[in-house]
Amino acid sequence: MNTGISHGGTETRSKTEVKTRISLPTDPLTEKIIACSMEVHRRVGPGLLESIYESEMAIELEFAGIKFQKQVLIPIPYRGRLVGEHRLDLIVENKIVVELKSVERFDPVFEAQILTYLKLTNLKVGLLINFNSRRLKDGIRRFLL
């Protein structure tokens, strides 16, 4: 599997290979989502609940004319049987999974969570955005499958 994780100028293609880039290539939709999150953070800053940031992101995405779904239920199959479901924060334009956080620091389980969401949705791009960051750009990670 070719998993790409970007954070702080690095992009990981696998667990053993790390490539550092000054500027990671992003698509226009990803840039628009990040711009919306920056606007939310600029207006309200860190320290709110994740659910509040989700509502504010929905407003910004609407203002930007970007289609999205909130709180999307994703079935979890096992051997052909449904064993449960996950609830995604946002799916944008049926292309990008956006998982919002308001936490002190990123935990490795968040990376596993978004990678699982990408696999379950068959989508290739995910954004993990932690609004509880002093500088939001330090709280954004991009994932590629």
Q: Which residues does each predicted region cover?
A:
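Short, low-complexity, charge-dense intrinsically disordered segments
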Residues: 1-21
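Nuclease catalytic cores
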Residues: 26-31, 46-50, 54, 58
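A short, surface-exposed helix-loop junction/capping segment
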Residues: 33-42
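Conserved catalytic cores of phosphodiester-cleaving nucleases, focusing on short active-site segments
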Residues: 45, 68, 88-106, 117
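A short acidic/basic microdomain associated with nuclease active sites
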Residues: 62-77
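Basic/aromatic recognition patch in beta-strand/loop cores that engages polyanionic ligands
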Residues: 77-78, 83-88
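Nucleic-acid nuclease catalytic cores
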Residues: 101-145
